[in-house]
Swiss-Prot record:
Disulfide bonds: none annotated. Residues 95-115 are annotated as: Disordered. Residues 1-36 form a transit peptide. This is Mitochondrial zinc maintenance protein 1, mitochondrial. One of its GO terms (molecular function) is protein folding chaperone. It comes from Aspergillus fumigatus (strain ATCC MYA-4609 / CBS 101355 / FGSC A1100 / Af293) (Neosartorya fumigata). Keywords: Chaperone, Mitochondrion, Transit peptide. It comes from the Eukaryota. The gene is MZM1. GO terms for cellular component: mitochondrial matrix.
C-alpha cells in the first residue's frame, strides 16, 4: 500500500500534466519540453525527505500558475502587420483592473493571485 505522501505526489504530478495540456494545447514542442521538465524534477526528488511536502506544494502551485496565468500567442503569418492572436481559455484568470482605477492611492491587496 502506498504512503499518503506518494499518493499526494502522484496527484500533484497529474495536476501538472493536465495543466501543461491546457496551457500548451497547440504547441507540441513546448508541451513536450514542459512535461519532460516536470518528469525530471519529480525524478530528482524521488526519495521522500524533510522537504517533500514543500516540493509537492510547489508542484501544485506550478500547476495552478500554468492553468490560470499562462496565455500563449500565435503570430498571424498572413497579416503584414504581424498581429498576434492570444489563446485565452476558460481557466485563465481575468483581473478587473481595480488597482488601475485608483489613481495614485495606495492599493490593498486582499489575496495573492494564486489563492
Amino acid at each position: 500500500m502506498a504512503s499518503q505522501t506518494a499518493v499526494t505526489a502522484r496527484s500533484a504530478y497529474r495536476q501538472i500534466l493536465r495543466a501543461t495540456r491546457i496551457a500548451f494545447q497547440d504547441d507540441f514542442r513546448v508541451l513536450v519540453a514542459a512535461r519532460q521538465e516536470a518528469r525530471r524534477q519529480f525524478d530528482e526528488h524521488r526519495r521522500e525527505g524533510i522537504d517533500t511536502p514543500m516540493q509537492i506544494n510547489h508542484a501544485k502551485e506550478v500547476a495552478a500558475i500554468l492553468r490560470h496565468n499562462i496565455v500563449q500567442g500565435v503570430r498571424d503569418s498572413n497579416d503584414e502587420n504581424g498581429k498576434w492572436e492570444l489563446r485565452i481559455h476558460d481557466d485563465i484568470e481575468r483581473g478587473d483592473n481595480d488597482s488601475i482605477r485608483v489613481g495614485g492611492k495606495k492599493v490593498k491587496v486582499d489575496k495573492p493571485c494564486s489563492a
